[in-house]
Amino acid sequence: MNLSGKTVLLLAPKFFGYELEIKKELENLGARVIYFDERPKNDFFTKVFIRLNLKSFISKKIDDYYKNIIQEIKDESIDFLFLIAPETVSIETIKQIKSIHKNIKIISYFWDSIKNKKTALEYLNISDKYFSFDSNDIKIDKKIQFLPLFYI
């Protein structure tokens, strides 16, 4: 795939450097990549609240974090929003990004089974492409495509 001249907004959790390897590979394909951690913070409590879907306890922190991101990217010309294992970014935030970047294509990838991610299916309808590493997930909806894990 040639991404020459394209800009990718990458929202992915910091996870053993995978996000940096993915960013580097997108750049090797020619893309300009703007990366932000999908989580507003990586401390223990933030991770617990997100993982247990108790985001209401940190909703102000999440809202402020994404307002800052939207402010930072508003003047960019973004072609793709690449969401990896999204848990924190709200559908409303994605809609705001899409309203600014009208032609943006949204790609979601889950490297954990959908059954383990309570909010995973929320991203299905807003995504142009939706991938899971779990071959069982493709049975949930015809829009879900199988994409095995990568290795570094």
Model-based region annotation:
Residues 1-111, 123, 129:
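N-terminal pre-catalytic "stem/leader" segment of glycosyltransferase-like enzymes
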Residues 96-152:
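Catalytic core of nucleotide-activated saccharide and alditol-phosphate transferases
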